[in-house]
């Protein structure tokens, strides 16, 4: 019978199709993750890929689930094929789901609540349910072959003053730890997820000494260099099932050393989820290898 409890750490690398097709259902955080750097990493590895992002800024699961139920023409559908991005406004979720035979479809919480599965912290209470369950049902009914992916974005930069950071007492380590906890709760409640993208770990790893707390462009969204590249590296490694370290693609103007740090931050996140890996020179030396 069908395996009902896939290991979220399962490496799907052996069964990948000739062209990997990835659809993210998300917001600006999925744009950060998949729209800029991911294609180049696959291309450098000689792997054909099509990448889609169903985008509404800041969109939480509740709104995605409502849009799925009403099939609202509410999305900007960004699609990268052959290295070129097209943007189609006023797209329905059903249209995007039917557009390709998607290999992977990711979902994520938005509006700053990705550290809350069914959680109360100080004055904030939030639940991803029943929205997450209902969204998964819609996706599975329309895309039976797709592997479901859960994306767990990163914590804000220390000192960020936006309202969403108040849900975490304006404390980066509180936010990071709550994202780790919420993600584990999601995966326990939903064994349907074949993979999870622990972007919070990759970003937090990269924040250790070499790059520092400079991964965002505004305290919240990833910057266009190290931020987006690091998370792109994580997605690449998780999907390919092989290490991103040594991939020849890096953004224009990025040094080889910086690229190696970003790749290593992502690789260590894949190897050690829900943990921060110190990438300082001393720590790497203690581990008897160069980062």
Indicate residue ranges for each PLM-predicted region:
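Conserved beta-strand elements of the Class I
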Residues: 21-23, 105
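Bacterial Sec-dependent N-terminal signal peptides
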Residues: 1-16
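Conserved catalytic region of serine esterases and O-acyltransferases that act on ester linkages
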Residues: 215, 219-222, 226-291
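Alpha-helical cap/lid subdomain in secreted, periplasmic
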Residues: 90-224, 237
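Conserved SGNH/GDSL esterase-like catalytic core that processes O-acyl groups on lipids
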Residues: 32-129
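Short, well-ordered coil/turn elements that cap or connect secondary structure elements
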Residues: 17, 44-46, 143, 190-191
């Amino acid at each position: 019978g069908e395996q009902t409890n896939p290991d979220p750490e399962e490496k799907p690398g052996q069964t990948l199709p000739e062209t990997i097709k990835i659809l993210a259902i998300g917001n600006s955080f999925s744009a950060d993750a998949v729209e800029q750097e991911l294609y180049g990493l696959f291309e450098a590895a000689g792997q054909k890929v099509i990448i889609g992002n169903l985008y509404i800024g800041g969109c939480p699961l509740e709104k995605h689930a409502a849009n799925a139920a009403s099939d609202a023409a509410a999305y900007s559908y960004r699609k990268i094929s052959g290295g070129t991005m097209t943007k189609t406004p006023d797209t329905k979720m059903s249209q995007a789901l039917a557009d390709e035979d998607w290999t992977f479809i990711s979902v994520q919480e938005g509006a700053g609540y990705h550290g809350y599965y069914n959680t109360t912290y100080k004055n904030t209470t939030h639940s991803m349910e029943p929205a997450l369950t209902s969204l998964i049902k819609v996706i599975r009914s329309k895309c039976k072959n797709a592997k479901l992916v859960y994306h767990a974005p990163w914590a804000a930069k220390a000192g960020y003053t936006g309202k969403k950071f108040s849900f975490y007492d304006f404390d980066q380590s509180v936010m990071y730890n709550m994202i780790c906890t919420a993600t584990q709760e999601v995966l326990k409640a939903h064994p349907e997820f074949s993979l999870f993208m622990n972007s919070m770990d990759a970003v937090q790893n990269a924040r250790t000494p070499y790059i520092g707390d400079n991964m965002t462009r505004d305290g919240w969204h990833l910057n266009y260099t190290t931020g987006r590249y690091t998370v792109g590296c994580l997605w690449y490694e998780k999907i390919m099932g092989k290490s991103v370290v040594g991939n020849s693609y890096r953004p224009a103007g990025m040094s080889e050393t910086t690229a190696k740090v970003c790749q290593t931050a992502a690789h260590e996140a894949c190897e050690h989820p829900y943990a921060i890996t110190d990438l300082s020179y001393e720590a790497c030396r203690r581990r008897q290898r160069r980062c």
